UniProtKB/Swiss-Prot annotation:
Its EC number is 3.6.1.-. The gene is cof. Its cofactor is Mg(2+). This is HMP-PP phosphatase. The active site is at residue 8. It comes from the Bacteria. PANTHER family: HMP-PP PHOSPHATASE (PTHR47267:SF2), PTHR47267. HAMAP family: HMP_PP_phosphat. Catalyzes the hydrolysis of 4-amino-2-methyl-5-hydroxymethylpyrimidine pyrophosphate (HMP-PP) to 4-amino-2-methyl-5-hydroxymethylpyrimidine phosphate (HMP-P). SUPFAM superfamilies: HAD-like. Belongs to the HAD-like hydrolase superfamily. Cof family. Keywords: Hydrolase, Magnesium, Metal-binding. It catalyses: 4-amino-2-methyl-5-(diphosphooxymethyl)pyrimidine + H2O = 4-amino-2-methyl-5-(phosphooxymethyl)pyrimidine + phosphate + H(+).
Amino acid sequence: MARLAAFDMDGTLLMPDHHLGEKTLSTLARLRERDITLTFATGRHALEMQHILGALSLDAYLITGNGTRVHSLEGELLHRDDLPADVAELVLYQQWDTRASMHIFNDDGWFTGKEIPALLQAFVYSGFRYQIIDVKKMPLGSVTKICFCGDHDDLTRLQIQLYEALGERAHLCFSATDCLEVLPVGCNKGAALTVLTQHLGLSLRDCMAFGDAMNDREMLGSVGSGFIMGNAMPQLRAELPHLPVIGHCRNQAVSHYLTH
């Protein structure tokens, strides 16, 4: 059995209504009783995840912002990675040919330029929400990531624009079909999990991980046992065809797999 279990949240542990199911919570508690280290590896913000862990009384390590931050059980910052200020400036100030909304993250929270109530549906479980700002006045020195939310085809065209403008100065990935992220070079959940396992004196072979999107690719591909959700992005299955595919998040498939 693995010594550490790493879980993506959206599309993996969370059901389509963005809640954790009772079976899932019960399974997580049983893993802890068996001294398996729990790690939540997510694109969500550390502030939100710390709130969720507190509400559930769960002991878990946190990989948040798609690897930009790693926190210990006690909330100590173990690792940080920020976008270079010049990259953040270019992304924020450039006029992109897109209908997607832009969202900026730093240690203080989630920021965007206008109200988009529909996006808050994904945060009903925690109550976490964006803060409205003038994007052009955003401090550039501590931006963890920038993401664009919108139609997938539109985001695919935007991805080409971003590649042309940024070259090798940032890492671009889809954390969902409707969310394209701009991250620091070399920053991903797999790299962050490597940092965490070294801190814990473990190897990646000692880990199992579950995920559904392209931001899970490096993590799933590097651990001893990686599992792809039945509802995963087709691109993820194509990138990691050797990994087993389990059930759908709506059926709490992670819990079902771990208890059967």
